[in-house]
Swiss-Prot record:
Quaternary structure and partners: Heterodimer of a 70 kDa and a 82 kDa subunit. Part of the early transcription complex composed of ETF, RAP94/OPG109, and the DNA-directed RNA polymerase.
Swiss-Prot/TrEMBL keywords: DNA-binding, Transcription, Transcription regulation, Virion
InterPro entries, sorted: Poxvirus_early-TF_lsu
Pfam families reported for this sequence: Pox_VERT_large
Subcellular location: Virion
Entry GO CC: virion component
Job of this protein: Acts with RNA polymerase to initiate transcription from early gene promoters. Is recruited by the RPO-associated protein of 94 kDa RAP94/OPG109 to form the early transcription complex, which also contains the core RNA polymerase. ETF heterodimer binds to early gene promoters.
Name listed for the protein in its UniProt record: Early transcription factor 82 kDa subunit
Domain of life of the organism encoding this protein: Viruses
Amino acid sequence: MRYIVSPQLVLQVGKGQEVERALYLTPYDYIDEKSPIYYFLRSHLNIQRPEIVKRHILLTLRMTQLKGYLGNLLDIKDDIIIYSHKNNLEYSYVDNTIFNPFVYTQKKTLLKNDSFLYNVYSGACDFLVIWVARACDTSIPEFGSYEDVDNNIIKFETMLMEVFPQLDLDITVESKFNNIFRTNLKLTGLKKIIQRVQDLDINYKSLLSRYDEHFINMTGNHFILNDEQLNLSIWDLDSTLALSSDGDTVMINNVKLFTDLVSDIDTQMERIKGDITYKVHLATPINSRIKLDIETSFIFIETATNNILLSSDKKISIILAKNHISIKVKNHIPNIEKYFTFLVIAINAMFNSVQKSSDFTKVETVYWSRICQNTKNKNRKPIIINYLDPGMKKISNNFYRSDEKEVFINDNGIMFTCIDPLGKYNKVGFLNIFHDMRKYCIPCCFLHDQSHRSTFSSCVHQIDVEKKIVSPYILNFGKVVTESKMSFLPIIFDAFLNDGMTANMEQDNKRLKETSGYHIVRCCAGDDIVRLRTISDIIQFVNEDKNILIVNDMIYFPMNATDIGKKIHILIQEIVHEVMIVKKKESSDKIDFFPPNYKLLKDLFPKQTIQTPIHSDAGMVLTTDGFYIDGKLFNEDLSSKYVTFTKNVIASDAVTKYFSPLFKYVISEAKDRFIKTWMINIMIHMNVDPNNIIPTLEKYYPNSGRAQIN
């Protein structure tokens, strides 16, 4: 889809608010008669032929910067007031009434702000109309001001208009919402949402669930509870979680669906945290290592990382890659992701269209002395020479070797070699970190031959390095691990799973040198990110995925021992990661991953694997390995036509006191609810003596896991 930069309208008005000039701003050479701006001109202002001006108001400007720009655009040297019929700009009333300098009232407090245009003008990416009046022509001339134009803004705009015809704005946008709000839905609101899902008949799966500290989980669509907290989950047709709520908070992934479901419910929502991540795919690749050659803080702010930019208000982050751009915003701003992508593509065309080779000496003061440094016993800094020794063997067009030395020639023709007075660091290699980040071939001196390294192959033989190469640096546990990274396990599990295993690290850092096998954390399992927010989400994931999951210091197993798979997952910041064994040879950069030793955790499973009947009645048998009806494992989904009731049961005082508040008033329509309410009834009927609870449980669940842990 090709992004069309919307036209903009600037209206200069006189004393009677009559339009003196109508400027139609566009980077194109024509009027788009189908645009909302032209419709507004023709239908509301009766202006058929405005002035076409090949300019563009940057939506990232502050109000003071905008006033300076508009004064320059209209060639006005007097104090001016800017306003709009649709949104408040530099002035607004305390009740957010639209400000008009010709119709001023002192009954309301007037506020002045210097915010960014895209924040104060809703929909500015698609429809921007700004009215400009000389302050002396209004009823409040004292509110006017004059601002000098920032020459950098004009310079940037001129360059933007020059490169615009060559920009490829064919883009495709994907979005992901992660919004969490504090709300007062409570049980009543959740039940209304369930009813609305059923009324809309949209075939979305909805589920109410309830769990306690003992992980007794109840699920279904109809509950009658006394002040008990519930969890609501709704999945769309692709089985993607659309929203999740416990009545007090709600996480929203599908904003439109949530809006439809609560249109008549007073949710009293208060944002806790929220963001939207847009992934914009580009038809034409860009240079991800962007560099701004003029002062452009009125658009983006550069960061220490070359491929990351921030918006001027630092609330929007932009991560650049060759073929796509990721934009993360705090609040929904219509089409801001497309507009920022347009600016990035333009800047790339202005300043970064050709990848320039970097001379090593230009980065010497930043990196050479820190990473490839000379110390008392190490001479790792290469030296520059002016010629090749006779008899040196040509390895490639930029690398020569003899028995005494190796020489690398960079793209600028500068020759580097390693001559260590101690005779140790004489092998030329390259710094991985800069090659991985920027494809820079920065030479450094090493103890051993580097020709087997992937970075060496790329710099010397121009062999493409695998894109998904994993960095040998191991992160501390706690951060989300990306595809090219790995991290340590939490201390308690690192000690347990890696007992008897070793990983040799380089001195003074966390770079893996060699290991014959060591458990670590890898990135998210599978192609899609799996986010588990509640205990109910965790239990459901484990039972469906049928693998072990580590959450904090707890281990979650599938309900049936025979279902336990060979994977180990671990939850970090609500995102599912994988535990794997890493292997690496000291002589190679290649890192291999293998399945974990899952049996170490499986042996802790607190339930015997030999099937033992617990109770049976009327052909229904509850065993330690599942629930059977007429000898057949019960694993079919129940239709919502079938409803089960948990009745009040006369039992011992201790059992009744514990279970009655939880299960006395429950009605449900789901398989899990049917099984668990039936099971609890059996437990209550058994009339277990409170003094014999532990021995009775150990009869059916003899392996608690404590013996293995101790």
